[in-house]
């Protein structure tokens, strides 16, 4: 798949639902306009059976990068899903998940992401 460098599409990607780009929107725009293929990654832990609305914007933006021809990776952490993420949890006990629970959670997450990200696209797969 060739890289789409249409400036209006890139401008929308960098402004719609985007608060900040690090190091800067200007630098990322220059790279996107150059036609250089990027690899964009989102990693997550399937600690529950469903996504929440807060995830949607990230996945919509990931799909926009994919539509422009960039390689996107939607990674679900197996081990980190099983042990739980301690970030901002203080001393709260974390429920340990079995491998089977994580596999089932991952399947439901992929089903929920499919309407937003074209994970089955043969030309530029996720």
Language-model segments: residues:
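NTP-dependent nucleotidyl-transfer catalytic core
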Residues: 1-126
């Amino acid at each position: 798949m060739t890289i789409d460098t249409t400036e209006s599409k890139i401008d929308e990607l960098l402004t719609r639902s985007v608060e900040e780009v690090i190091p800067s929107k200007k630098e990322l725009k220059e790279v996107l306009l150059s036609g250089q293929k990027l690899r964009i990654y989102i990693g997550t832990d399937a600690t529950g059976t469903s996504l929440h609305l807060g995830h949607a914007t990230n996945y919509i933006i990931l799909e926009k990068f994919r539509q422009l021809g960039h390689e996107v990776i939607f990674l679900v952490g197996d081990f980190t899903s099983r042990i739980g993420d301690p970030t901002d949890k203080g001393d709260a006990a974390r429920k340990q998940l079995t491998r089977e629970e994580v596999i089932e959670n991952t399947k439901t997450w992929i089903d929920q992401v499919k309407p937003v990200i074209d994970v089955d696209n043969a030309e530029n797969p996720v």
